[in-house]
């Protein structure tokens, strides 16, 4: 009789371990962003010597509703999400705290619209340079994850032909 209850207890422990392990693997997939947000057509505009501000552009495609809540880069002290819009014949630029992404809908950051502003550049950005970004997203389930990408500095003409 005792042997049966020991085996039954072992089954419960094993079931718990397997369930817990599966839950951790699902959380790890969300946490590292694998296949969660796809980033394509990314490029950074080159700057002139002495220029302290730059811009980056890319297209996001999220597998589920998510929000871009932060961006860091190795070439600048701060990165902000900005939007440009025409109001009463005047072009205005506004900082956005976050950028909502709708599942399955591409979201394009492009000149004249949404883009990433790179402030206090540490060095000029020359054509051919690589810029590292760490993008922080929050899923609809409130899971946060970072996605690291390397982006090439290109002229607008080059960027439009490499897509």
Regions found by a protein language model. Give the residues of each.
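N-terminal secretory signal peptides that target proteins for export/translocation
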Residues: 1-9
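Bacterial N-terminal signal peptides
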Residues: 12-25
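Compact, glycine-rich, soluble single-domain proteins
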Residues: 30-163
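A general marker of short, structured functional hotspots
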Residues: 8, 16-18, 133
């Amino acid at each position: 009789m005792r042997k049966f209850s020991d085996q039954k207890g072992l089954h419960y422990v094993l079931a718990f371990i397997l369930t817990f392990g599966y839950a951790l693997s699902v959380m790890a997939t969300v946490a590292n962003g694998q296949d969660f947000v796809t980033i394509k057509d990314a490029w950074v505009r080159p700057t002139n010597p002495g220029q302290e501000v730059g811009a980056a552009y890319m297209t996001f495609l999220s597998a589920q509703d998510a929000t871009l809540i932060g961006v860091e880069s190795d070439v600048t002290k701060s990165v902000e999400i900005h939007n440009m819009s025409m109001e009463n014949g005047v072009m205005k630029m506004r900082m956005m705290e976050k950028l909502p992404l709708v599942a399955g809908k591409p979201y394009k950051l492009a000149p004249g619209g949404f883009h990433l502003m790179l402030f206090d550049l540490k060095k000029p950005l020359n054509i051919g340079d690589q810029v590292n970004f760490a993008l922080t997203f929050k899923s609809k389930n409130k899971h946060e994850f970072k996605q690291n990408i390397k982006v090439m500095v290109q002229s607008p003409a080059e960027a439009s032909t490499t897509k």
